[in-house]
């Protein structure tokens, strides 16, 4: 039976290991905090004493690590032990520039590399659900595609440019965190006005706030700031109301939005659509 290696058994990595084990795949794991790796031994994983030992003889290698520096450090440690031709699949969320440079360094060393960050929770990883992005050489992707598809609900191959998956992962997480900040402000305003925050969230069962992504998002991307369906000046008035409704309680997102709106208004954009909150290169169309 082919054996794979997974480096990094935090919450997400452990979920992936459990999914592999449930599918009958033999998995060797290593983690910087050994206890986290040891917890998977009872479920059938083999725990290696070092990352090099984990990847030695493995037919495929997976990384689920916290940051670029750790990824680079582990790669240096495992490089001599990698089986010739094995594909290293990195699921870590990393900087696009760092990912591109990493891919080039590895290519020069003859190491096959694919970046495949994910949008999934630990439970989704264990269940083989969610979305996996992938970018890197077509040949490498084609070779591991079936295995990656078995790990998730959908694999989206973005192309050969090695940093695309890293960038798209940050795009997605940017919206996740921005929405989380807006939700935090809704909770603050609700409490300040004697409304149960759980009840306040019911507005989003009727008002589909996410539609702005598909509506205004493309306009902002193209720099189309006129005609205005929601002018910056009117939106700024509403943001002022939100800040006032919080009754001196600190908000997460709205003060930053207010600052950007003030910049746009000062630059003559009061009558532009709120798509003008995007980069200053925006032009009226």
Task: For the regions a language model picked out, list residue spans one by one.
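NAD(P)+-binding Rossmann beta1-loop-alpha1 motif at the extreme N-terminus of oxidoreductases
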Residues: 1-63, 86
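Rossmann-fold dinucleotide-binding core
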Residues: 4, 93-174
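Amphipathic alpha-helical hairpins
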Residues: 15, 53, 60, 66, ...
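Hydrophobic residues within alpha-helices
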Residues: 16-17, 36, 102, 147, ...
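Hydrophobic beta-strand scaffold residues
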Residues: 27, 47, 113-114, 155, ...
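Rossmann-fold NAD(P) dinucleotide-binding segment
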Residues: 51-112
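Helical "substrate-binding/catalytic lid" subdomain
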Residues: 164-281
């Amino acid at each position: 039976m082919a054996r794979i290696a997974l480096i990094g058994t935090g919450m997400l990595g452990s979920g992936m290991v459990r999914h592999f084990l449930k599918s009958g795949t033999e998995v060797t794991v290593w983690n910087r905090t050994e206890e986290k790796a040891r917890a998977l031994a009872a479920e059938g994983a083999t725990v290696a004493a070092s990352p090099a030992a984990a990847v030695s003889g493995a037919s495929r290698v997976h990384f689920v690590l916290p940051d670029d520096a750790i990824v680079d450090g582990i790669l240096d440690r495992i490089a001599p032990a990698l089986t010739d031709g094995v594909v290293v699949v990195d699921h870590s969320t990393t900087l696009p520039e760092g990912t591109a440079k990493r891919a080039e360094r590895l290519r020069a060393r003859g190491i096959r590399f694919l970046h495949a960050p994910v949008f999934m929770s630990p439970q989704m990883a264990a269940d083989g659900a969610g979305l996996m992005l992938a970018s890197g050489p077509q040949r490498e992707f084609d070779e591991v595609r079936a295995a990656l598809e078995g790990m998730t609900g959908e694999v989206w191959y973005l192309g050969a440019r090695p940093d695309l998956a890293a960038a798209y992962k940050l795009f997605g997480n940017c919206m996740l965190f921005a929405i989380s900040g807006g939700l935090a402000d809704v909770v603050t305003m609700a409490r300040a006005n004697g409304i149960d925050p759980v009840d306040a969230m019911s507005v989003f069962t009727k008002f589909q706030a996410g539609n702005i992504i598909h509506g205004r998002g493309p306009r902002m991307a193209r720099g189309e700031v006129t005609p205005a369906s929601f002018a910056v000046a009117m939106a700024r008035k509403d943001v002022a109301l939100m800040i006032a409704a919080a009754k001196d309680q600190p908000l997460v997102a709205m003060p930053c939005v207010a600052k950007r709106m003030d910049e746009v208004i000062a630059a003559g954009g009061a009558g532009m659509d709120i798509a003008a909150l995007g980069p200053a290169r925006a032009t009226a169309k």
